[in-house]
Amino acid sequence: MSKLSEKKIIELFQSKLGNASFVPEDVELFKIGKEQLVVKVDTFVESTDLPPRMKLDDAARKSIVSCVSDFAAKGVRPIFGIVSLTIPKKFSRSSIQSLARGFQIAAREFSLKILGGDTNEGKELVITFSLFGTTKKIVTRSGAKTNHVIITSGPFGYTGAGLSILLKNKKSSKKFGTKAKTAVLKHMIQYFSLLRPPDSFVEDDRCFQQTCLP
């Protein structure tokens, strides 16, 4: 990314797209009938997000977890997902199957249905995942009031620190380093059970084989 801050980059797009301001939340939303459609998109890039020890199925799962965690923060249940893949030519059939397995695991874990997506060839692995859901009201950043209780699924900062340790060889204490690296390699979150329906499904893992495998 350029030397411009993320905020400045967004402002440049705002000026060209005619939006006075994007929704200042972790998700995008717009009204459809009596409900709001909630959308989240996140991109996983091999050179900046994939530590040497991370397995490809964990990488695929992580790309979905990044979106699901923002849905959880807004009190929204994920329903559908779409994935776009840029796959290096060097990837073997086994590597691509590992990616498909990671998507399948996450879809079942978070009770969402992956509808399909797009595949391309490139120099490195890039996963862009879009998540969709509906709600009547989200938990906004501006909604916090005095005496409200804030609940998190774990401590903050371990994933970012772990990436710095694994990708940039940053130094840390052994205890902290172990926790940080584990946070990256496992990328586990505890999702609110009240947001999850009793059934768990993925459309059909054959769709990955048909679109991704030679």
Describe every region a protein language model picked out.
Residues M1-P214:
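Helix-biased detector of long, well-ordered alpha-helical tracts
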